[in-house]
């Protein structure tokens, strides 16, 4: 499909278009921001991740679409090639969208793409999206923080670049959220148990978050390995006492609330 807003004189005149790094959100097309949807409807070309759905791409029927997917364990597009595609398309088109799953600034390789665009003096804007961690917490109705139980949250991934050690330090936080979990989350569970974390620690796994085939697994830490064997799609793993069911968590008393208010004051 040909783009509708391209400028044939851009390349010859040395003029670049503007590039938007847009967060597509966790998956469902209606979870993209209003600004993101408006820009998609105006885009000349959209370079999109592998996890972006057809329903999301239907928001930009006028645009040329280029798949530049990166999936763990699958054939992926090299990041240098993606960077070059962004620059080359900014030479051809006035409005270029780089559509990323979740939020561009969290495990989205945004730094590398921003550097490539800035090197060529190309104007760029980042449009945030709903990250998978927040969407998973919402869809499972499990807050990541809870007064008196969990005051800190860490987002991390065990996926590493070639040549890097695969022994990623596990953050020391009340609630752990592991992106791109899969096999790596099994190793995380084993290490946490070896470090003395209780086997009964609550775990919530969300597979295919916000999509029609979404699935939520509620497990214990010592059940995570067997639970993940059921999963085939992208998963996000949340670990910590805040993930216990509300029936298992005490209701905060007025006295506790007053004490916390005094401590804050």
Please provide the spans of the model-predicted regions.
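Short hydrophobic alpha-helical segments that form membrane-spanning helices or hydrophobic packing faces
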Residues: 34, 135-138, 188-189
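A contiguous loop/helix-start segment that scaffolds small-molecule binding in enzyme catalytic cores
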Residues: 2-9, 16-21, 91-96, 152, ...
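Short hydrophobic/aromatic-enriched beta-strand-loop microsegments
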Residues: 64-70, 121-125, 144-151, 196-205
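Short, acidic/turn-prone active-site loops that include or flank metal/cofactor-
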Residues: 26, 51-53, 69-76, 130-132, ...
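Short, well-ordered alpha-helical microsegments
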Residues: 53-56, 133, 163, 185-186
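Residue-level signal for well-ordered alpha-helical positions
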Residues: 59, 139-140, 191
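Class I SAM-dependent methyltransferase SAM-binding "motif I" and its flanking Rossmann-like core
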Residues: 103-173, 215-218
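Class I S-adenosyl-L-methionine
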Residues: 1-127, 223, 230, 235
């Amino acid at each position: 499909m040909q783009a509708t807003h391209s400028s044939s004189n851009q390349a010859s005149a040395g003029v670049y278009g503007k590039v938007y790094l847009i967060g597509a959100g966790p998956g469902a097309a209606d979870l993209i921001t209003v600004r993101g949807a408006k820009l998609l409807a105006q885009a000349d070309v959209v370079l999109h991740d592998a996890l972006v759905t057809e329903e999301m791409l239907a928001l930009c029927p006028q645009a040329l679409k280029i798949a530049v997917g990166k999936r763990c364990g699958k054939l992926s597009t090299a990041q240098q090639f993606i960077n070059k595609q962004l620059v080359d398309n900014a030479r051809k088109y006035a409005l270029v969208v780089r559509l990323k799953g979740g939020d561009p600034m969290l495990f989205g390789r945004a730094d590398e793409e921003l550097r490539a665009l800035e090197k060529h003096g190309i104007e760029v804007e980042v449009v945030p999206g709903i990250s998978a961690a927040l969407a998973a917490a919402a869809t499972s109705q499990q807050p990541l923080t809870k007064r008196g139980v969990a005051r800190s949250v860490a987002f991390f991934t065990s996926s590493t670049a070639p040549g890097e050690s695969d022994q990623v330090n596990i953050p020391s936080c009340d609630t752990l959220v592991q992106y791109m979990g899969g096999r790596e989350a099994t190793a995380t569970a084993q290490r946490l148990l070896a470090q003395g974390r209780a086997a009964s620690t609550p775990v919530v796994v969300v597979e295919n978050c916000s999509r029609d085939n979404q699935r939520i697994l509620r497990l214990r830490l010592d059940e995570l390995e067997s639970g993940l064997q059921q999963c085939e799609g992208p998963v996000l793993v949340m670990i910590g006492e805040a993930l216990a069911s509300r029936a298992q968590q005490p209701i905060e008393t007025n006295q506790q609330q007053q004490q916390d208010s005094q401590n804050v004051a």
